[in-house]
Design a protein with these regions (language model features):
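Conserved alpha/beta-domain cores
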Residues: 1-117, 125, 137
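C-terminal helical cap(s) of enzyme catalytic domains, especially alpha/beta-barrels
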Residues: 120-148
Length: 148
């Protein structure tokens, strides 16, 4: 968090209250307001962080109470699946939550959902921000791990 203060336009991954507490503390000290998206773990995946679909509305409202955090919407990453109906249902759940939030919060401008492999479906379901790193820059190259 200490490296983000004053250097970001939008934090896409506000995924827990402990992070919000630390962000609030540092942003207040720097007289800065952090624009953030609430991260939602729409597939309930153990390998991803974020609030569950059931927690998202209450978490968003609680985050709005931090004076130096301005909530701007929601962010989610779809699970990897060949079941397009399942993925569409997750996207539509996110859209419903976003619509509720947008009606209550004039700052809620973004539904960030969709990456290089699934952005078309996400846009069809209402996403207005996509992340296309792999399409633009190629697949990530991870260092080879050795046991020695």
């Amino acid at each position: 968090v200490k490296y983000l203060i004053g250097k970001t336009h939008l934090i896409h991954s506000l995924d827990r209250f402990e992070l919000a507490d630390e962000l609030q503390k540092r942003a207040e000290k720097a007289a800065w307001t952090a624009d953030c998206l609430l991260e939602v773990n729409i597939g309930s995946e153990l390998t991803k962080s974020g609030f569950s679909l059931d927690e998202a509305l209450a978490a968003y409202e609680k985050m709005r109470a931090y004076p130096n955090i301005r909530m701007r919407g929601l962010m989610a990453m779809l699970p990897i699946s060949d079941d397009s109906q399942y993925l569409r249902s997750l996207c539509l759940c996110m859209r419903k939550i976003y619509d509720i939030i947008k009606n209550e919060d004039p700052n809620a401008a973004y539904l960030s959902m969709g990456m290089s492999g699934d952005w078309r479906l996400c846009v069809e379901c209402g996403s207005n921000m996509i992340r296309l790193g792999t399409s633009l820059f190629g697949a990530r190259k991870y260092p080879v791990q050795t046991n020695g």
